[in-house]
Amino acid sequence: MKKRLTITLSESVLENLEKMAREMGLSKSAMISVALENYKKGQEK
């Protein structure tokens, strides 16, 4: 089940998020999910 979350980002972080999401063909929400999953995998090593 998906839940809604509201976050506050600096302009530069938001611009980077939008650019990365656009380049990968993902929504901002999906981009954040991918980034968190990748971070989690990196921490497990």
UniProtKB/Swiss-Prot annotation:
Gene Ontology molecular function: any one: sequence-specific DNA binding
Classification via Gene3D superfamilies: Met repressor-like (1.10.1220.10)
Signal sequence extent: none
SUPFAM superfamilies per the UniProt record, alphabetical: Ribbon-helix-helix (SSF47598)
UniProt DNA-binding residue ranges: 16-36
GO biological-process terms attached to the record: plasmid maintenance; regulation of DNA-templated transcription
Domain of life, source organism: Bacteria
InterPro entries associated with the record: Arc_rbn_hlx_hlx, CopG, Ribbon_hlx_hlx
Induction and repression of expression: Represses its own synthesis.
Pfam annotation, one family: RHH_1
UniProt KW keywords: DNA-binding, Plasmid, Plasmid copy control, Repressor, Transcription, Transcription regulation
GO cellular component: a single term: protein-DNA complex
Assembly description: Homodimer.
Function: Regulates the plasmid copy number. Binds to the repAB promoter thus controlling the synthesis of the plasmid replication initiator protein RepB.
Record-stated family: Belongs to the transcriptional regulatory CopG/NikR family.
Protein name as catalogued: Protein CopG
Organism listed in the record: Streptococcus agalactiae
